[in-house]
């Protein structure tokens, strides 16, 4: 349908800007066969010059929208000049989400202003815009894996001097997504200094997958609260909805747990590099206003060390040679045989439940447990022999399960409900015996092995729900130099946005795709911190966002022109997103190919 409207689009734009001269303009753009072609402007021509972004908005099926809508996406044929100071948002149904709706409305206006390049000043002439928000469930503001994120967006002229935009949704989250889409329908005519808006719009949209996330490891290196909020801001711009906070590990314990203060006092990298309850609440609220749940992970029983030194509840901490006991230094695992450990866990979980109070799920970690580490402890060996267990792989799985069941009970108690729990793939989750240990109704399994791992099919056939984080496409720390020794890191090479985009959960899961809740890009932080965060994540995470929102049947080539634009939009937001191509390619579509 889009190809048939290209001539109409050009006519529509001409009608709106016909009276404006462009004598000083050197270049103009024209839509030709789905590409915006750069042409030398002729001031004597009766055809006014068309700006690049105005051309891109209509020269392909989804305009400049990211992620692409999954339902109807009719962008009409016309752009209207808009007065930036005459945009009003009106909430038609009041309820418990009023504060969130008002915050979203304020942010929407800020997002609209992103269409204006730094240093440009739009003319304050043009039509007024009235945005009407119709939330059918204005009292519902809880995250859930079943929440309705759908929305409908209608834009149409209203008389000679106004444009009406109406967003309808069944939740605040859908409403927020609709505002995000609407903000992307504004472009700046840098030839005439006018803010423009698509005048006739009909969009129906909803995500394919309910879980669309980014994991950030803030234990191996510290990230400022400002950088975390900046990440969530960018996530909201591309409709990602879960910030998975891997907040502790063996290298540091920066989470301020008031019930066990020695953990962070002894475990933080410095007294300043901690996450207080007030700071976490700020992040959680920031995420809620942007439709992003903040999901805590307390990784156990492995990946513990710093902070636990004086508890007598760990084994093999800083053991040497480390390669014999863990996958990276320092080693450390909890001792499941210590009864006192489980009160510690309940206290940590309770402190997390208090501050991460919007989460509907909880991540318990559970990867890379070393049998050799546990087997190095006399007390653990004695416990296993008392229980008539051997010291073999199967018996250590029993010990691990002993820990997991007790930790599970403490998590339910701390959160005050039986919430879904997430575990990483591991020897405990092996499909050959997982149902001996983990109930498929209680646990979601997050896959970090490759996308062709036979474990995926085995887990799906047994009815388990999965989140895909296969490292061969979604580990954003891959492709850098080794941090122990020389050479490249373990999961090299670097993963480009194209591979991220083409990593389809539906293709991986096939007939079991309904059991896949979504996916998540992971940034493990051995070699990243606040100063490198943006470039590691963006714009690659935007590729993940469209894959999980739309699950397109097409590949990255069809999305490239929009991908280049969303990168530019992120930069305008203050995100230091990595450059994908020379800017020349953005201005000359179709020339930069292999």
Curated annotation (Swiss-Prot):
Domain of life of the organism encoding this protein: Eukaryota
Keyword set includes Disulfide bond: yes
Inhibition and activation profile: Inhibited by O-(2-acetamido-2-deoxy-D-glucopyransylidene)-amino-N-phenylcarbamate (PUGNAc). Inhibited by thiabendazole (TMG)-chitotriomycin. Inhibited by 6-(dimethylamino)-2-(2-(((5-methyl-1,3,4-thiadiazol-2-yl)methyl)amino)ethyl)- 1H-benzo[de]isoquinoline-1,3(2H)-dione (Q2), a synthesized non-carbohydrate unsymmetrical dyad of naphthalimide and thiadiazole having a dimethylamino group at C4 of the naphthalimide.
Site (Essential for chitooligosaccharide substrate binding): 328, 490
Effect of residue 448 to F: Slight increase in KM and more than 1000-fold decrease in kcat/KM with 4MU-beta-GlcNAc as substrate
One GO BP annotation of this record: polysaccharide catabolic process
Enzyme active site: 249, 303, 368
Mutation effect (residue 327 to G): 5.3-fold decrease in Ki for PUGNAc inhibitor as a result of widened active pocket entrance. Slight decrease in KM, but decreased catalytic activity with 4MU-beta-GlcNAc or GlcNAc-beta-1,4-GlcNAc as substrates
Disruption phenotype: RNA interference of this gene does not cause any visible changes in phenotype in larvae before pupation. At the pupation stage, 20% of the larvae show abnormal phenotypes. They fail to shed their old cuticles completely before starting to form new ones underneath.
Glycosylation sites: 164, 375
Any one cellular-component term (Gene Ontology): plasma membrane
Enzyme Commission numbers on file: 3.2.1.52
UniProt cross-references to Gene3D superfamilies, sorted A to Z: Chitobiase/beta-hexosaminidase domain 2-like, Glycosidases
Signal peptide from the UniProt entry: 1-22
Thermal dependence of catalysis: Optimum temperature is 30 degrees Celsius. Stable up to 40 degrees Celsius.
The family this protein is said to belong to: Belongs to the glycosyl hydrolase 20 family.
Function according to Swiss-Prot or TrEMBL: Hydrolyzes one beta-GlcNAc unit at a time from the non-reducing ends of substrates, with a preference for shorter substrates. The 2-acetamido group and the beta-glycoside bond linkage in the substrate are required for its activity. Active with p-nitrophenyl (pNP)-beta-GlcNAc, pNP-beta-GalNAc and chitooligosaccharides (degree of polymerization from 2 to 6), but not with the complex N-glycan substrate (GlcNAcbeta-1,2Manalpha-1,6)(GlcNAcbeta-1,2Manalpha-1,3)Manbeta-1,4GlcNAcbeta-1,4GlcNAc-PA (GnGn-PA), pNP-alpha-GlcNAc or with the long polymer colloidal chitin. Involved in chitin catabolism.
Protein name: Chitooligosaccharidolytic beta-N-acetylglucosaminidase
Native species: Ostrinia furnacalis (Asian corn borer)
């Amino acid at each position: 349908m889009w190809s048939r409207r290209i001539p109409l689009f050009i006519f529509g734009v001409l009608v709106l800007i016909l009276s404006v001269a462009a004598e000083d303009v050197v270049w103009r753009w024209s839509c030709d066969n789905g590409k915006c072609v750069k042409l030398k402007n002729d001031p004597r021509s009766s055809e006014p010059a068309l700006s690049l972004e105005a051309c891109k908005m209509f020269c392909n099926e989804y305009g400049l929208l990211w992620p692409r809508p999954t339902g109807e996406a009719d962008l009409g044929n016309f752009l209207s000049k808009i007065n930036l100071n005459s945009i009003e948002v009106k909430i038609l149904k009041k309820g418990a989400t009023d504060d969130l709706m008002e915050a979203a409305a304020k942010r929407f206006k800020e997002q609209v202003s992103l269409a204006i390049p730094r240093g440009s000043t739009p003319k304050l002439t043009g039509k007024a815009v009235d945005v009407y928000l119709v939330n059918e469930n204005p009292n519902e503001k809880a995250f859930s894996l079943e929440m309705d994120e759908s929305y409908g967006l209608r834009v149409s002229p209203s008389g000679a001097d106004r444009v009406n935009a109406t967003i309808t949704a069944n939740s605040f989250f859908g409403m927020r997504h609709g505002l995000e889409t609407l903000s992307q329908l504004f472009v700046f005519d840098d030839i005439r200094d006018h803010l423009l808006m698509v005048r006739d719009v009909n969009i129906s949209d909803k995500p394919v997958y309910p879980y669309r996330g980014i994991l950030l490891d803030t234990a191996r290196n510290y990230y400022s609260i400002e950088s975390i909020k900046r990440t969530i801001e960018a996530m909201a711009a591309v409709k990602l909805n879960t910030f998975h906070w891997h907040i502790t590990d063996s290298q540091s314990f920066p989470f301020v747990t008031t019930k066990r203060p020695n953990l962070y006092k002894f475990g933080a990298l410095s007294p300043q590099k901690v996450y207080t309850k007030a700071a976490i609440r700020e992040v959680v609220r920031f995420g809620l206003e942007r439709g992003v749940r903040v999901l805590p992970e307390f990784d156990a029983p492995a990946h513990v060390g710093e902070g636990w030194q004086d508890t007598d509840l760990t084994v093999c901490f800083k053991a040497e040679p480390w390669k014999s006991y863990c996958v990276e230094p320092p080693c450390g695992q909890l001792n499941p045989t210590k009864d006192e450990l489980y009160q510690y866990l309940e206290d940590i979980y309770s402190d997390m439940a208090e501050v991460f109070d919007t989460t509907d799920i909880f991540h318990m970690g559970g990867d890379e447990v070393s049998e050799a580490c546990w087997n190095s402890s006399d007390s653990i060996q004695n416990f296993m022999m008392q229980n008539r267990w051997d010291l073999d792989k199967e018996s250590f799985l029993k010990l691990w399960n002993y820990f997991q069941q007790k930790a599970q009970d403490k998590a339910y108690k701390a959160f005050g409900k039986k919430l879904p729990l997430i575990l990483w793939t591991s020897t405990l989750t092996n499909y050959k015996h997982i149902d001996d240990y983990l109930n498929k109704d209680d646990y979601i399994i997050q896959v970090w092995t490759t996308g062709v791992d036979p474990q995926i099919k085995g887990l799906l056939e047994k009815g388990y729900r999965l989140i895909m984080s296969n490292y061969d496409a979604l580990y954003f720390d891959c492709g850098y130099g080794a941090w122990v020794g020389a050479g490249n890191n373990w999961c090299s090479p670097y993963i480009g946005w194209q591979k991220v985009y083409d990593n389809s959960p539906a293709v991986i899961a096939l007939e079991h795709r309904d059991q896949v809740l979504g996916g998540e890009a992971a940034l493990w932080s051995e070699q990243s911190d606040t100063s490198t965060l943006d470039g590691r994540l963006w714009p690659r995470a935007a590729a993940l966002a469209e894959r999980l929102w739309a699950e397109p049947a097409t590949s990255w080539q069809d999305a490239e022109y929009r991908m280049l634009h969303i990168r530019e939009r992120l930069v305008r937001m203050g995100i230091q997103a990595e450059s994908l191509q020379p800017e020349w390619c953005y201005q000359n579509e179709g020339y930069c190919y292999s």
